Amino acid sequence: MSKSPILSSRTLVLIVFSIAINMLGGQISSMIKLPIFLDSIGTLICALLAGPWIAVLTGLLTNLLWGLLSGPIAAAFAPVAMMIGLSAGLLAHAGLFRTLPRVILSGVIITLALMLVAVPIRTYLFAGTTGSGADFFVAYFHAVGENLLESVAITVLGANIADKILSALIAWLLVRRLPLRAQQNFPHMARVR
């Protein structure tokens, strides 16, 4: 029995579908200036169905395409999207997407992992402001005496912990609801029960 290729046609369709979910969620959040992003649900779905490397690729392609369509800010955050995909995929394959408490814990861990990349990008490339709804919080913490790095770190933690827990829950619920026949199309799928 031969192993199926990691980039099957189904996986490529999953990547395209996931990029669309990411961009739709991110655009809606951006248009109404929510302090969360909702731009990684598709990446998390990829992490659960196809593993960390497909999720990394999905995050990268999402942000590069988004950067071409809307401006360079999204492209600058491609390493963050890649970290989200990598950490979610590794957590999923370690069994941390099997129960509700584990999914919530995964959202927290993903947030801590992405902070290693997002805080320096937001601080040093954009001086704390990127045009998102979270800019208000950076300005507030900076105005009450925190330095810029601390203001950005607090804001990134606050905005992303809620966002990544919510995104992880949505992705987990969607993947759990897939019929068994659909799940069998993804041989690298993590266990979600």
Regions found by a protein language model. Give the residues of each.
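Hydrophobic transmembrane alpha-helices
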Residues: 1-49, 53-64
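Alpha-helical transmembrane segments of multi-pass membrane proteins, especially transporters
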Residues: 14, 39, 43-44, 58-62, ...
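Interfacial aromatic-anchored transmembrane helix boundaries in multi-pass membrane proteins
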Residues: 23-38, 60-99, 126
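Membrane-embedded alpha-helical hairpins and interfacial helices in multi-pass inner-membrane proteins
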Residues: 31-33, 72-76, 97-193
